[in-house]
Amino acid sequence: NFYFYSFPSLFWGIGYNNAVNNANKSKYNRFQAQIKVDFLLKLVKNLYVGPLVSFDYVHGKDFKKPELLENMAKTTRNISAGMALIYDSRDFLTNAYRGYYLKLEQRFSPSFMGNKYAFSTTDLRASYYHKIWKGGILAGEFHTLINTGDPPWGLMALLGSSYAMRGYYEGRYRDKDLIEIQL
C-alpha cells in the first residue's frame, strides 16, 4: 500500500482539552507519505496471518501556533515492523451484505530502527454486516488504536476521517489512543 497526502490542514494540538478549545484552531501545511507492506498467509478458511513493515514520513510546516506541538519535531520519519491477523468472512469485500471482518495489527517502532520516537501501536477493527431486508443492511464497526510509548504528533490516533466518524474534522481530536463505534 502507498498513501500520499499534501494539503493545507488544521491543527488544534494534542489531547481532548486542546481539541475542544476553538482558540487553538490553527492552519498548517501537511505532507505525509506511507509505504506499508504486509505478507499474509492463509491459515484456514477466512483466517490470515503475516508480517508487516511500514515507513511513514510526516512533515508539517507553516504552523500558525507551533507551541501546540509541545516541543515535538515538525518532521517525523518512522519505520515499524509487526504482525497482522485477519478474519474475513464478508460475502463481497467492497459492498458486504453479510459476514465479519476482524483485523488485529501490532506494530513496533523501536529507536534501534532509527526512529526518534519509540512506541508501539495496537490497531483492532471489528466489523459486522447483516442483511435485514432486500436492500437493507445493518452494519456495525468497532475500532480502537492504542499507542504505548512516545508516538509523534503525526502518527497519533485521529478521530474523524472519510471512513469513520465523518462529522468530525480529521485530526481535530488527536491523542495516543482512540476508541470509536459506529452503526
Regions found by a protein language model. Give the residues of each.
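C-terminal outer-membrane beta-barrel translocator/porin domains of Gram-negative envelope proteins
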Residues: 78-182
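Gram-negative/organellar outer-membrane beta-barrel architecture
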Residues: 1-78, 82, 161-163, 171-179
